[in-house]
Amino acid sequence: MHLIIAGREYSGSTTLSQTFGEWGAANMEGGRWGPNEYHDHWKLPHISNFSPPPPDEVASVVACYPDARDGDYTRTGLSHEEQAQIMALSPKLKEMVQRYHLQYHLHPSFYGQDDHIMVGAHFDEGILGPIYFDYGGDGQYADRRVSNRSYEKQILELGPDTILVLVTASPDAIRQRMKDNPHLHGALQDADVERVLARYEEEYADSLLTRKTRLDTTSATIEESTGEIIEKITALMTDDDRQRIKGGAA
């Protein structure tokens, strides 16, 4: 299965990638469905792989990274010092790192695996770069509105069955989540919520990926949204992937 789950910070895209991964581990034959097998690396400065801590180390990890208390360890892959080093890079270097980083994840070796799941990918990188990091904007080098379509052409060549899921939520819900569990070194600012949500909608509308769907997490529980994303993804799977579901049905 080739899958991209995209959504603004606090929308639930990372949470749902994790719960969908848990479903995949329990219900899909073959593939790699470990807790960090999906690729969620495009929200600067959180661009490194992470490893969920063993139970006896959870408390110490949460003490160092308080926003991991709900079990989201995607912002723990780099030390605080390393995150500061990433953020100290010039816009030119940030652009280069992210461009090379994304291109690496479009290597045919990834698409040769049974499953290749990215979270955010060119959506996160191409939207956050121009708004917060002064690169890839209109008229700048590697304009992300242009390069995102180029990335999608590559994706369609490598994985024409790629499914795109846009996870969204209302501005009020996003702001409440920002208040309830602020992310360490998160990019999103209160004043930009509507603007950033609008950019995700634009990218979704302009996407060349035709197997696409969306879900709104505004008022849904995690369990309800998990059920919805499973239903919507399985409806868009290839027949081969659907046959990998244990028991033959979702």
Predicted feature locations:
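Pre-Walker A (Motif I) flank of P-loop NTPase domains
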Residues: 1-3
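Glycine-rich phosphate-binding P-loop
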Residues: 5-20
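Phosphate-binding beta-loop-alpha motif at adenosine-nucleotide cofactor sites
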Residues: 6-7, 161-169, 173, 177, ...
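Conserved substrate/cofactor phosphate-moiety recognition/catalytic segment
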Residues: 18-108, 124, 128-130
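NTP-dependent small-molecule kinase module
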Residues: 24, 180-184, 188-250
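Loop/turn-to-beta-strand initiation segments
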Residues: 112-116, 161-163
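Structural recognition of the conserved hydrophobic beta-strand(s) that form the central parallel beta-sheet
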Residues: 116-119, 167
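A glycine- and Lys/Arg-enriched "phosphate-lid" helix/loop adjacent to the NTP-binding pocket
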Residues: 125-202, 243-246
